[in-house]
């Protein structure tokens, strides 16, 4: 075995160890039949929606099929389609998001959520993105049971399981994995005293804590509302927890097209990375290096007699198996797409560079026809 081959194997081996350490802890929702109906808390689900006539019906239908009844509020954020009409037809309460004419710069999802909270007196508030879907009749019960374990206090957030249908949607695989790993909660090496980050698609809290922390008002000038919420609850010494949605909560992201997907990940990727603990970021980088070394070793072995093709193929296979295993925790991605991990890695790097440019230099990102300034 040559020095080059030894170096490639060692590098890939280090990547495998890093991949294990960065995501060797899991927090999954669970449903206990014996505890069904145990809660006496009133619950409201608040859904910020802008031009969501295609995706909103799936969420509202899944909410109507739950084993527990909840109030459903849809905040229509200046939609120009049938979002409001469809929501009313499906039994939701609909309110318009109104903006004053005094130079109000607080717009978008966080503002819609903040207004939505003012329309309910329920004990527990659940904010859900319009692209979320509950996967079975006990999903909401599982969410509430999990929240009950923290005595119905603080903030609980959920990253839905990503389902995909079109080929380009599989390119979101690494972004979803990094979203989970980057919150600093899913590794045994995470520092417990670090910043409390939260996922944005589904957040759960009680009304009194929301008022105490001022809720989404903390995200008035931030592009990732989940991070702002987590930090606000942490400042008030309230618990902040994060869960994976697999088995109970899912979403389909960016079904509108490839361009929308790029815009969506661009608007917050670099911001999210800046909040990841340094040693977790180091594990992520070392793991990503495996994409390069395992593929390069395999490719070079086809042309260089000094490299064993069998050993390089084994190294590539081991890395790819771990790559598939980690990604299937966060989404229903094609094994074929995951097997060509070097392409997914290239897309991730290009979008990350573009995100970094927007967030640190242009200070502007575009999303759903709106231009957002980044402070």
UniProtKB/Swiss-Prot annotation:
The keyword Cell membrane applies. InterPro entries: Glyco_trans_2-like, Nucleotide-diphossugar_trans. It is found in: Cell membrane. Gene3D superfamilies: Spore Coat Polysaccharide Biosynthesis Protein SpsA, Chain A. One of its GO terms (cellular component) is plasma membrane. This is 4,4'-diaponeurosporenoate glycosyltransferase. Its EC number is 2.4.1.-. One of its GO terms (biological process) is carotenoid biosynthetic process. The chain crosses the membrane at residues 7-23, 112-132, 280-300, 333-353. GO terms for molecular function: glycosyltransferase activity. Belongs to the glycosyltransferase 2 family. CrtQ subfamily. Pathway: Carotenoid biosynthesis; staphyloxanthin biosynthesis; staphyloxanthin from farnesyl diphosphate: step 4/5. It is a multi-pass membrane protein. It holds the Pfam family Glycos_transf_2. It comes from Staphylococcus haemolyticus (strain JCSC1435). Its main location: membrane. Keywords: Carotenoid biosynthesis, Cell membrane, Glycosyltransferase, Membrane, Transferase, Transmembrane, Transmembrane helix. PANTHER family: GLYCOSYLTRANSFERASE, GLYCOSYLTRANSFERASE 2-LIKE DOMAIN-CONTAINING PROTEIN. The keyword Plastid does not apply. Catalyzes the glycosylation of 4,4'-diaponeurosporenoate, i.e. the esterification of glucose at the C1'' position with the carboxyl group of 4,4'-diaponeurosporenic acid, to form glycosyl-4,4'-diaponeurosporenoate. This is a step in the biosynthesis of staphyloxanthin, an orange pigment present in most staphylococci strains.
């Amino acid at each position: 075995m040559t020095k080059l081959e030894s170096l490639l194997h060692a590098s890939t081996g280090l990547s495998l160890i890093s991949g294990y350490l960065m995501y060797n802890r899991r927090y999954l929702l669970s449903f206990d039949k014996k505890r069904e109906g145990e809660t006496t808390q009133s619950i409201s689900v608040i859904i910020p929606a802008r031009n969501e006539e295609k995706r909103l019906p799936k969420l509202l239908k899944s909410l109507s099929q739950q084993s527990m009844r909840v109030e459903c509020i849809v905040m229509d954020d200046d939609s120009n389609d049938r979002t409001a009409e469809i929501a009313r037809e499906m039994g939701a309460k609909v309110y318009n998001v109104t903006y004053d004419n005094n130079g109000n710069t607080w717009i978008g999802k966080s503002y819609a959520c903040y207004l939505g909270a003012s329309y309910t007196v329920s004990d527990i508030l659940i904010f859900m993105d319009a692209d979320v879907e509950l996967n079975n009749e006990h999903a909401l019960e599982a969410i509430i049971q999990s929240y009950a374990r923290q005595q119905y206090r603080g903030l609980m957030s959920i990253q839905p399981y990503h389902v995909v249908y079109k080929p380009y949607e599989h390119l979101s695989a690494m972004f979803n994995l990094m979203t989970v790993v980057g919150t600093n909660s899913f590794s045994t090496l995470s520092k417990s005293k670090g910043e409390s980050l939260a996922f944005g698609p589904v957040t759960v809290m009680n009304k009194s804590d929301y008022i105490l922390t001022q809720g989404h008002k903390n995200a008035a000038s931030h592009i990732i509302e989940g991070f702002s919420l987590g930090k606000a609850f942490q400042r008030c010494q309230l618990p902040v927890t994060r869960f994976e949605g697999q088995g109970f909560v899912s979403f389909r992201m960016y079904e509108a097209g490839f361009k929308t997907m790029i815009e969506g990940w661009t608007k917050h990727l670099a911001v999210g990375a800046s909040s990841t603990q340094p040693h977790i970021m180091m594990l992520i980088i070392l793991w990503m290096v495996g994409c390069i070394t395992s593929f390069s070793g395999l490719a070079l072995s086809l042309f260089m007699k000094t490299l064993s093709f069998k050993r390089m193929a084994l190294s590539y296979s081991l890395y790819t198996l771990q790559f598939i295993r980690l990604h299937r925790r966060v989404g229903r991605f094609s094994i074929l797409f995951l097997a060509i991990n070097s392409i997914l890695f290239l897309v991730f790097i290009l979008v990350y560079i573009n995100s970094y440019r927007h967030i640190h230099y242009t200070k502007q990102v575009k999303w759903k026809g709106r231009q957002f300034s980044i402070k």
